[in-house]
Amino acid sequence: MKQYNIKGMSCAACSARVEKAVSKVSGVTSCSVNLLTNSMSVEGSAADSDIIKAVKNAGYGASSIKNKEKAEDTSTESPIRPMRTRFITSLVFLLILMYFSMDHMMWSFPLPKLYDGNHIAMGLTQLLLTVIIMVINQKFFISGYKSLIHGAPNMDTLVALGATAAFGYSTFALFAMTKAQVAGDMELVEKYMMEFYFESAAMILTLITLGKMLEAYSKGKTTDALKGLIELAPKSANVIRDGKEVNVPVEEVVKGDIFIVRPGESIPVDGVVIDGHSAVNESSLTGESIPVDKEPDDKVSAATINQSGIITCKALRVGEDTALSKIIKMVSDASATKPHIARIADKVSGIFVPTVIAIAVVTIIVWLLIGKSAGFAIARGISVLVISCPCALGLATPVAIMVGNGKGARNGILFKNAAAIEETGKLKIVALDKTGTITEGRPVVTGIYPAKDITEEELLHIAGSLEYNSEHPLAGAVNQEIEKRKITISPVKNFNALPGNGLLGEIDGVIVMGGNYRFISGHTVDKEELKNISDKVSNEGKTPLIFAKDNHYIGTIAVADIIKEDSHKAVSELKKMGIHVVMLTGDNEKTAAIIGKEAGVDEVIAGVLPDGKENVIRELMKKGRTAMVGDGINDAPALTRADIGIAIGAGTDIAIDAADVVLMKSRLTDVAASIRLSKSTLRNIHENLFWAFFYNTIGIPLAAGAFVGLGLTLNPMFGAAAMSLSSFCVVTNALRLNLADIYGKRKKTE
């Protein structure tokens, strides 16, 4: 996907125009323009030069940008400063203009004697002040008329036409009044003085500038999360070059470089510890505040903070391949895409401005035909032009997506695209892979059952001595228990691993063995006791590791992949949301049922082979929108097949690449949080679109004078004020998403 900066856009009509122009370029398969960030995402084989040329022909500017530049492009500080200057300067001259145009009606002190009865001087002063304000805000006229010439009128065109119409008619009225005064027709002079709309033209420009400034400030807030991620990126690294430690820009670090990180420093790139021990704060990536101990062979990530010892690391992933860069790209790409619901606004935006101009012209003609004065008719037409707001339509969706995406990023929930944000809230079924998702993904000792006259320590001593030599996954659970209890083990002679059965060896000349029921029962005389405890452990959904010494049963160790602490809570939250929760596992039905009951799922599908998960998901999708949650390589096909694939962040890169949503904290409760966030974001988009459509549906007829019979009319100045605030309201409403309760905490306290 190629990214471009777009210059000159002021409203949704602009973005629609650019999108339409670029979509016609040969080789472009898809194009999405984001009005919020003034950026464009293009997929296809088209050359940069052809794309930039198409944008230029549409009346705008374009330049190619790199991923690392994206957040910098979201900065709004630079446009706000000149807007603020324009607004303050315009406001000063506007107040002076209002003083002359409304004199004693507005101010308590009189006009200078020069203007006493001098209507021409009064009119010329208003004209001059209006010209000054128009020059200050010339951007609207340059952009508006340039777009009109290119056949792509935008919001600036509406403002420019409205201000020009008000100024033009007022200038005509001033000329007519001057002519009447020279002729001595004072009645006509008074009439034309009432037709001055200089203050309307000035007020339109000043209020629209204020609205744009507030909008830009609010839009800047929506990109705070993305900018915050960028700011995490370290700027330099201490690498070993030619045997010496040198400080270089992080961009110069290459894969394989050896770098040193001291306490308090950020880790510059993803790597692996080769020397030293430390505790690393990974909260910037995972959200977990507890530091993680690091020792040789442990991996470290860019932008995490080394808190204690000095560590020497080897660079594994640099530049755009680091975890931080991938997160930034994911957040940025998600904000650059559009959900399906945005298509409605896009279609309307494409014809909005020409339609408004046509309505304004028709409004003027109709009022003139009815017999109203030219001033009244033109005022109604100007009101139509300046109250109409395509920006509110254009911003309704992208601001909500940006804020919702940022809210997710701050909580370790990453959506890969806008469609994922939109669809996650519509889920009816959530399928959870058992291993590593519901459970810890590693076996642990859950029970120790020594035989009569045998202590736990004696049993663990023999078990640990045997399992120390084994490479079986279950051996790790026993060895971990041995280390935890600090039990010493003995060397084993004649060790032999029997696949499918168990382990055999000698300790101090005595034959010892460990394994499954079938293997041990064939070599012991205590079959009844052995069977009872084996059945008990198996019925609990655990794996019995049975041990014997000198043909006598000495005890059983129960091993199981236990469920995570938050699994039951996570499943419970999903069920409360009306979602059907399914657990997928390769275990037998008996074991799967026990784990499923402990987790609280609605349905258990057992005996699912790795390559069969995709087929199970396909069947579930027939019953409703389905999400697959997993973390392993064998989950990738199912993650891709599901309506929404959700990867647990601690899983493999393959699973993360295949998913639509990534949970960085590896916390299952974030599945429910992602659904709540999606629902909140979609609700916010609906609110924004409703406001945008409702505002224009009511505002345009009101401005046109459709309710004059009811005594309701709209002065162009109030129309401009409404327009300037409409976009601000949309953006401000989107910012409310930052307060969304995605973890359901408020309900618990009510």
Model-derived features: positions:
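Juxtamembrane coupling segments of multi-pass membrane pumps/enzymes
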Residues: 185-187, 202-263, 294, 344, ...
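Conserved cytosolic catalytic loops of P-type ATPases
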Residues: 25-49, 53, 195-196, 227-321, ...
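ATP-driven catalytic headpiece of P-type ATPases
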Residues: 85, 304, 425-471, 501-582, ...
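Conserved catalytic phosphorylation-site environment of P-type ATPases
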Residues: 285, 344, 379, 392-466, ...
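Transmembrane helix-loop-helix hairpins at the membrane interface
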Residues: 82-236, 347, 716
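Conserved ATP-binding TGD loop and adjacent catalytic N/P-domain core of P-type ATPases
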Residues: 16, 29, 337, 344, ...
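Flexible metal-binding regulatory segments at protein termini and peripheral loops
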Residues: 1-123, 244-245, 325, 329-337, ...
